[in-house]
């Protein structure tokens, strides 16, 4: 029996962009523009100004998901997750503390994936294509296997994605 993780469309967020694989949840247009710019492979003369279009964020996310799936050779048929785009790392710290319910002992990651909620948490302060691809790898891995592999194994695979993303 395969259980799908429920993904709710941006509960509590004021704005969202839907893509083939994700709901991008954000609070303001400027934050989404920074997110879109941050996840681009490189600045291109031809894409200048496109980061102002919400659909551009969706296109870039879907391209990253497809690249990650190819690298891992994992194509989950029911892949669907949320991406919560926060304004700064303090917001990530607060979300991490709330979700882990353990408090924070040590360093909070710059971004993280919660299998329980099917959500990637990122901040526009620290976003890059590599960081997002790493977290997308966790989502792909968790959706691919009926029982997600241990965290250390997932981390090895996600680091593989980091290393080979642009090859």
Language-model segments: which ranges?
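N-terminal signal peptide c-region/cleavage motif recognized by signal peptidases
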Residues: 4-6
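Cleaved targeting-peptide boundary
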Residues: 8-16
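Auxiliary, metal-adjacent structural segments of Zn-dependent hydrolase domains
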Residues: 10-11, 53-116, 125
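Acidic/histidine-rich, surface-exposed loop or edge segments in extracytoplasmic proteins
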Residues: 18-53, 140
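Soluble periplasmic/extracytoplasmic beta-strand elements of cell-envelope proteins
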Residues: 23-25, 82-85, 121
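Short pre-active-site segment immediately N-terminal to the catalytic Zn-binding motif
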Residues: 114-133, 144-149
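Active-site recognition of the HExxH zinc-binding catalytic motif
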Residues: 130-143, 155, 159
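Post-HExxH zinc-binding segment in Zn-dependent metallohydrolases
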Residues: 148-167
